[in-house]
């Protein structure tokens, strides 16, 4: 091609949008692939590789070699909404939002219970603030709209926070207020 060499791979770092859908906008869907890095990229050791329906073995091999050269652990996901990590993670974050909204426990207790009880580095509400509540809502919406499964219905509290412009750390307000030295719960 005029802009993209005939051997070039076109990759998307999308965290949830189906690769086959994105590949339809590319000049050559055979060279289109999902290469999902996790934030912060220098710290996180995983790359999720997602093959679209038309993606060739040669394209997968180029991306596999690239990921290995970066020293990352690779996992291969089928082209399904949310792939592996966000298909599992976003329902957990969303359920934490439902639990908070329904008064099951306080923010801190939900985070502490999941952090210590599940041996996670942080609780789901803290993680949502780190990812960005707008991003969490967007991914949850992709899961819900793509599958039609009510288990992916976004929590009203998550929607409310995003509508209020509370996106988490990037706006200094989400489930926690980050304006001071120590984050404080906003509820």
Segments predicted by a language model, with ranges:
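A short glycine-rich, Lys/Arg-flanked "PGG" loop and its adjoining helix->strand segment in the class I
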Residues: 1
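NAD(P)-dependent Rossmann-like dehydrogenase/reductase catalytic/cofactor-binding core
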Residues: 58-61, 68-79, 98-102, 107-187
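Alpha-helix N-cap/N′ positions at the starts of helices
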Residues: 42, 88-92, 120
């Amino acid at each position: 091609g005029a802009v993209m060499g005939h051997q070039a791979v076109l990759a998307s770092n999308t965290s949830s949008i189906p690769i086959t859908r994105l590949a339809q906008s590319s000049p050559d869907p055979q060279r289109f692939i999902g290469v999902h890095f996790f934030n912060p990229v220098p710290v996180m050791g995983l790359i999720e590789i997602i093959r679209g329906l038309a993606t060739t073995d040669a394209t997968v091999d180029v991306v596999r070699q690239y990921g290995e050269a970066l020293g990352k652990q690779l996992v291969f996901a089928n082209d399904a909404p949310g792939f592996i990590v966000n298909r599992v993670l976003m329902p957990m974050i969303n359920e934490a939002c439902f639990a908070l909204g329904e008064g099951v426990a306080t923010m801190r207790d939900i985070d502490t219970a999941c952090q210590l009880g599940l041996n996670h580095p942080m609780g789901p509400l803290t993680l949502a603030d780190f990812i960005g509540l707008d991003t969490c809502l967007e991914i949850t919406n992709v899961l819900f709209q793509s599958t039609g499964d009510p288990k992916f219905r976004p929590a009203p509290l998550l929607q409310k926070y995003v509508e209020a412009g509370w996106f988490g750390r990037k706006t200094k307000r989400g489930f926690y207020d980050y304006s001071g030295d120590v984050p404080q719960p906003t509820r």
